[in-house]
């Protein structure tokens, strides 16, 4: 994906496979525009019909969901972290909601990253639609790739991610990535629904980092369309 692609070019690529439109998202009186997939049911039916889903955790388009954890993370960053003039990296950004929400927190530079090409396309479109391209860069970042990433050679002040700890096989590579790229004194924050909380990751992280955990309530839309209260764990890993 070229960083120079225009919004129209990105939308042309996206609409070759998805029926999408921008939907308003009101956050504290600030209206954001976020791409919404209107034919997700048909897209999933196609994946199932072609036997493309071997492992639901890996093959389903989880990147397309606006995860409530992104809103919880933004609240935590705003209230508990020093963000002015700091650098920020979002891992597993999906459609980029967290980075877009956190764009108002005074970061000097932000990177929204994922390993899924479709996620990067949607994030780039959302960034351009909200005129944040001078603040947020969209990059393919694979934490499982060995060695240091030269793009983050100066280190990152804050690394954040919502709902990426569900794969146990990712825990060790993720901690290795933090060791290489988190600045001294930097913090990584992971938000997870309590139903998917991973104590094993915190135990591993505590061998090398200072680890703390807190809990914040959030609201999701249940299967019946009604709001449902949930509790989220916020795990902070400090170098």
Regions found by a protein language model. Give the residues of each.
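S-adenosylmethionine-dependent methyltransferases
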Residues: 1-239
């Amino acid at each position: 994906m070229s960083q120079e692609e225009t919004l129209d070019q990105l939308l042309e690529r996206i609409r070759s496979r998805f029926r999408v439109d921008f939907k308003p998202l009101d956050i504290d009186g600030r209206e954001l525009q976020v791409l919404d997939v209107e034919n997700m049911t048909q897209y999933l039916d196609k994946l199932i019909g072609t036997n493309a889903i071997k492992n639901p955790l890996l093959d389903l388009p989880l990147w397309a969901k606006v995860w409530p954890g992104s809103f919880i993370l933004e609240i935590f960053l705003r209230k508990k972290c020093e963000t002015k003039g700091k650098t920020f990296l979002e891992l597993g950004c999906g459609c980029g909601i967290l980075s877009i929400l956190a764009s108002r927190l005074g970061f000097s530079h932000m990177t929204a990253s994922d390993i899924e090409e479709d996620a990067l396309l949607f994030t780039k479109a959302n960034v351009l639609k909200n005129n944040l391209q001078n603040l947020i860069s969209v990059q393919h970042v694979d934490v499982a790739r060995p060695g240091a990433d030269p793009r983050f050679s100066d280190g990152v002040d804050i690394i954040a991610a919502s709902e990426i700890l569900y794969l146990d096989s990712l825990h060790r590579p993720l901690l290795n990535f933090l060791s290489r790229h988190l600045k001294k004194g930097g913090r990584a924050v992971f938000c997870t629904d309590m139903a998917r909380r991973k104590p094993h990751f915190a135990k591993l992280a505590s061998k090398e980092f200072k680890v703390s955990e807190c809990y914040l309530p959030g609201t999701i839309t249940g299967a019946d369309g009604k709001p449902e209260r949930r509790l989220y764990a916020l795990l902070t890993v400090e170098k």
